[in-house]
């Protein structure tokens, strides 16, 4: 009689419980596999093959906009293996016929780029800084945020966490949150209170998502209207209005849940679309950096190595007080500016040259770790 393996692996938490982030864009962690075969060795072998496929799919979902992913044929194992730098087993359990594991994959950036470019697929690599979502629900003329019930906040809490390029964070809803900002202040875009709660959560921006159920007079046709607006960050003041219609079977709860899920996906996809790497557009600029000590240049240099848009950078001159660098980058200067901002670096255009400096309002959020493969200089 076969031994039954009873084990519980880590279950993905909700957005409110955890902010799942990989160490860098080309690392895919927490890949769960569960395979049964005639022997444990065979089950393990099959599980690792399956893990390669699952990790590749997650990487593609992370980098490639939704409208492009359908253009990628399902790859074979022989297609995927050359793209993998390494993999490791984070945890595993096995019986005589079953294998369960949690795997972590590191992909080769250069090879993945070449793979996607060969298929004409556009993709992004820039990870946004953390964004705090405040779901405000309007009901019977009242604005709800921390109130119970707030079905809109509940729906956002049920959205699975994303390990994509746009890390969204939901507030806990504790006394500090209630003290810092009210539903009315969030809906009105009170800059001071929004900045206060954003700083406490280490967020670079706040996305206020206001929802209300609308009923069309005469027909009683129902829809959920949602307005989202960014406060702070590189997308400040961007506003989007969407409407979600009800079917005959829909309830408020089902439509609200669907809207939260779709908007979270759309927010991620919008970020990717705005930060696509344009390999066919190569530009350059010279930027000056004011220095008070050499350590600043060393830190700036390490940050520049992590910017996906940079094809290379070249030190033009350096003194005890100043440095000048030539940045050769893909796309336009605005995309480069946004990418640098995610690393707390400000790019500004001066009378002659551009300038680079550390952001004065850098959050306490730690910068993403270094990628497995650095951008060539």
Predicted regions: what they are:
Residues 12-16:
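Sec/Tat signal peptide C-region and signal peptidase I cleavage site
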Residues 2-10:
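Bacterial N-terminal signal peptides
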Residues 33-76, 193, 254-266, 295-306:
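Short, well-ordered alpha-helical segments
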Residues 48-72, 127-129, 133-190, 300, ...:
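N-terminal segment of the mature soluble domain
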Residues 82-91, 169-171, 186-219, 317, ...:
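A short, hydrophobic beta-strand-centered structural micro-motif
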Residues 27-30, 109-111, 201-252, 335-337, ...:
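Amphipathic beta-strand/beta-sheet edge segments enriched in Tyr/Trp
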Residues 234-253, 258-262, 271, 275, ...:
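C-terminal soluble interaction/assembly domains
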Residues 64-135, 145-151, 157, 189:
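Signal peptide-directed extracytoplasmic domains
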């Amino acid at each position: 009689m076969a031994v039954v393996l009873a084990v519980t692996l880590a279950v993905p938490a909700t957005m409110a419980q955890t902010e799942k982030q990989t160490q860098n864009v080309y690392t895919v962690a927490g890949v769960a596999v569960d395979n049964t075969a005639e022997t444990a060795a065979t089950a393990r072998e099959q599980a690792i093959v399956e893990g390669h496929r699952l990790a590749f799919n997650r990487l593609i979902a992370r980098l490639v906009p939704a409208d492009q992913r359908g253009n990628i044929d399902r790859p074979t194992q022989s297609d995927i293996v050359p793209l993998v730098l390494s993999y490791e087993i984070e945890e595993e359990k096995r019986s005589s016929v079953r294998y369960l594991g949690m795997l972590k994959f590191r992909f080769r950036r250069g090879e993945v780029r070449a793979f996607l470019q060969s298929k004409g697929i556009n993709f992004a690599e820039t990870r946004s800084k953390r964004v705090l979502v405040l779901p405000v629900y309007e009901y019977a003329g009242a604005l709800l945020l921390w109130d119970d019930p707030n079905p809109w906040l509940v729906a956002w809490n049920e959205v699975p966490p994303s390990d994509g390029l746009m890390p969204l964070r939901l507030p806990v809803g504790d006394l500090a949150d209630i003290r810092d900002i009210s539903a009315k202040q969030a809906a009105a875009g009170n800059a001071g209170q929004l900045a206060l709660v954003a700083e406490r959560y280490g967020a670079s921006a706040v996305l206020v998502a206001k929802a209300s159920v609308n009923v069309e007079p005469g027909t009683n046709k129902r829809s959920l209207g949602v307005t989202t607006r960014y406060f702070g960050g590189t997308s400040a003041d961007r506003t989007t209005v969407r409407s979600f219609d009800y079917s005959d079977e829909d309830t408020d709860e089902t439509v609200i849940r669907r809207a939260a899920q779709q908007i979270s996906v759309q927010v991620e996809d919008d970020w990717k679309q705005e930060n696509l790497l344009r390999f066919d557009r190569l530009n350059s600029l010279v930027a000056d950096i004011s220095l008070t000590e050499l350590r600043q240049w060393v830190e700036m240099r390490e940050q520049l190595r992590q910017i996906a848009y940079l094809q290379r950078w070249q030190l033009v001159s350096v003194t005890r007080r100043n440095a000048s660098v030539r940045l050769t980058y893909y796309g336009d200067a605005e995309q480069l500016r946004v990418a640098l901002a995610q690393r707390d670096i400000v790019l500004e255009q001066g009378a002659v040259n551009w300038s680079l400096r550390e952001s004065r309002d850098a959050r306490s959020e730690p910068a993403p770790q270094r990628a497995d493969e650095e951008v060539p200089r």
